[in-house]
A protein has these predicted regions:
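N-terminal non-catalytic cap/leader segment that marks the start of a structured domain
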Residues: 1-39, 156, 218-222
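A generic local secondary-structure boundary/capping motif
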Residues: 5-7, 28-31, 56-65, 78-86, ...
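Structural motif
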Residues: 13-16, 38-40, 46-47, 54, ...
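A residue-level signal for conserved active-site and pocket-lining positions in enzyme catalytic cores
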Residues: 19, 41, 73, 99, ...
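Catalytic-pocket segment enriched in acidic/His residues
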Residues: 25, 56, 103-234
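Structural signature of FAD isoalloxazine-binding scaffolds in flavoprotein oxidoreductases
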Residues: 32-51, 65-67, 214-224
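Non-heme Fe(II) oxygenase catalytic core, chiefly the N-lobe of the double-stranded beta-helix
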Residues: 46, 51-103
Length: 234
């Protein structure tokens, strides 16, 4: 209890997030067929936060703060332009992240009114995930050899003790070799870079009525074989 946990990789070269990568989450958000290729975006290093740290509610977008519990992998070697067959050789281990998302402008995006056309809508969605402390990560990194099958892990997100997300990682649309091979065509990943593999179903924006986080709430994400990432909002 006296130990302060920082993000396991406090200053990676890159934090990369894959989006819409769980079948049931894709259905709850858009009900469209699975894409041909992965989709994703870069998050700032300043968004990283350790387990047990407080997620600060931003005054400019305080009302629609969402959770996204995600299974992550960490690179152990420099990786660029690799094949799917070789991709897992570059993975050092696994951890957990919460892709916290401020969604206050979602109603305007859905209206499609200026300045919220498709391009600006996507941009606002990504900006809402990049506020300081909006990528809690941890509590530890488990080495690759400690996880027999990364697609057979139980992932659960709890808000104030209530289960919000409850899934197995076998619902991933694009598995790790596909993600690594696809994005390494462009990016050069470095040791310590963190990749979040996408959120499962059960996010707050996908519920009716919506469920969002507020100051005083506690959000926990538990991944089988890794541990529990826990943060409060302040």
């Amino acid at each position: 209890e006296d130990t302060e946990l920082l993000a396991p990789i406090p200053n990676p070269w890159m934090v990369f997030s894959v989006g819409m990568n769980y079948g049931r989450h894709l259905a709850e958000m858009s009900n469209t067929p699975p894409p041909e290729h992965p989709s994703g975006f870069i998050k700032t290093r300043d968004s990283l936060l350790g387990s047990g740290k407080a997620i600060k509610v931003p005054p400019q977008c305080p009302d629609w703060i969402d959770y996204e519990g995600e299974f992550c992998f960490v690179f152990g070697r420099e990786c660029h332009a690799v094949s799917e067959a070789d991709a897992m050789e570059y993975v050092a281990g696994y951890t957990i992240a919460n892709d916290v998302s401020a969604r206050d402008w979602i109603p305007d995006i859905k209206k499609g009114e200026p300045p919220f056309g498709p391009i600006h809508g996507w941009e606002r969605n990504i900006l809402g995930k990049n506020l300081p402390g909006f990528t809690p990560c941890g509590p530890v990194i488990v080495t690759k050899d400690e996880i027999a099958d990364p697609y057979d892990l139980h992932l659960q997100t709890r808000l104030n003790g209530e289960v919000m997300q409850d899934t197995k990682t076998d619902d991933l649309i694009f598995k790790l070799p596909e993600i690594i091979s696809y994005y390494s065509q462009w990016y050069r990943f470095h040791p310590g870079d963190v990749v979040t593999t996408g959120s499962p179903a059960g996010v707050g924006i996908g519920r009716d009525p919506h469920v969002f986080m507020h100051a005083g709430d506690t959000i926990e994400i538990e991944l089988e074989g890794v541990g529990v990432l826990s943060n409060t909002l302040s």
